[in-house]
């Protein structure tokens, strides 16, 4: 069982959900920071069958922010170079916690499911910035294939090891990668390089990896991006 606290938004219709979106917030944020977006998505008729699970990261010191404790999925040592030192232990620990949450959906033991089971192939793992990095790792390494990954303003960590960490079923992973080209925090180039790595180094199918660019968008989200995310969800976890 995962130790993470979650905010859960179930279908308004009261019907049993047939799909789940996990969405992980960024550094220093919480589930509350993305609850409005989740509520908006849940109100779309095409996504009325989806339940939204927003986990909260543990509070821990962050080297990049002078060691200040804050909600963080892993320690960030630097963001100026994708080949720099990484908190591998922290990355893998948070990834394992998300996998536990996925397993609880599979088993029907998660909050509010009451025995109703949601298989991995009906689950999307998404996140913003630091949360998106964990989402990519989770999608590539989960023991059972998930429906997709939604990675917003983020990058793929552990690139030197991911080829050995990934599961064979991740070869068919569907990825929604999105980034603003004016991002001063996580460089737009990092999103581009992540997509190139997924396609060229991990051999994901071109048609399974989407890359969306939002002109003049900084390290944030925008309405157009959320509409594109909704379209991705409608495609990979459609109503049954």
Curated annotation (Swiss-Prot):
Q: Which reaction does it catalyse?
A: S-hexadecanoyl-L-cysteinyl-[protein] + H2O = L-cysteinyl-[protein] + hexadecanoate + H(+)
Q: Is this entry keyworded Transport? A: no
- Highest taxon in the source lineage: Eukaryota
Key words, A-Z: Cytoplasm, Fatty acid metabolism, Hydrolase, Lipid metabolism, Nucleus, Serine esterase
Active-site residues, record numbering mapped to chain: 129, 183, 219
Per the record, the major location class is cytoplasm
User: What GO annotations for molecular function exist for this entry?
Assistant: carboxylic ester hydrolase activity; palmitoyl-(protein) hydrolase activity
EC number(s) on file: 3.1.2.-, 3.1.2.22
Q: Does Nucleus show up as a keyword for this record? A: yes
Q: Name one GO biological process term.
A: fatty acid metabolic process
GO CC: one term? nucleus
Subcellular location(s): the record lists: Cytoplasm; Nucleus
Q: Write out the function statement from the record.
A: Hydrolyzes fatty acids from S-acylated cysteine residues in proteins with a strong preference for palmitoylated G-alpha proteins over other acyl substrates. Mediates the deacylation of G-alpha proteins such as GPA1 in vivo, but has weak or no activity toward palmitoylated Ras proteins. Has weak lysophospholipase activity in vitro; however such activity may not exist in vivo.
The record's comment on protein family reads: Belongs to the AB hydrolase superfamily. AB hydrolase 2 family.
Question: What is the protein's name according to its record?
Answer: Acyl-protein thioesterase 1
Taxonomically, what lineage is the organism?
A: Eukaryota, Fungi, Dikarya, Basidiomycota, Ustilaginomycotina
């Amino acid at each position: 069982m995962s130790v993470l606290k979650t905010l859960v938004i179930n279908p308004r219709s009261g019907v049993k959900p047939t799909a789940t979106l996990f969405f992980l917030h960024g550094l220093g944020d919480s589930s509350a920071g993305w609850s409005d977006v989740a509520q908006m998505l849940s109100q779309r008729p095409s996504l009325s069958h989806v339940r939204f699970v927003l986990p909260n990261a543990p509070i821990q010191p962050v080297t990049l922010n002078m060691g200040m404790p804050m909600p963080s999925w892993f320690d960030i040592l630097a963001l100026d170079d994708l080949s720099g030192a990484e908190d591998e232990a922290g990355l893998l620990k948070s990834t394992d916690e998300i996998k536990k949450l996925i397993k609880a959906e599979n088993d029907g033991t998660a909050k509010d499911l009451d025995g109703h089971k949601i298989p991995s192939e009906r689950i999307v793992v998404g996140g913003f910035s630091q949360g998106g990095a964990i989402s990519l790792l989770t999608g590539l390494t989960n023991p059972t294939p998930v429906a997709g990954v939604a990675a917003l303003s983020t990058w793929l960590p552990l690139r030197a090891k991911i080829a050995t960490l990934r599961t064979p079923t991740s070869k068919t992973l569907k990825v929604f990668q999105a980034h603003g080209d004016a991002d001063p925090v996580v460089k737009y180039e990092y999103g581009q390089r992540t997509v190139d790595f997924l396609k060229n180094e991990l051999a994901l199918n071109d048609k399974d990896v989407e890359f969306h660019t939002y002109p003049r968008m900084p390290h944030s989200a925008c309405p157009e991006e959320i509409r594109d995310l909704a379209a991705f969800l409608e495609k990979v976890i459609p109503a049954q």
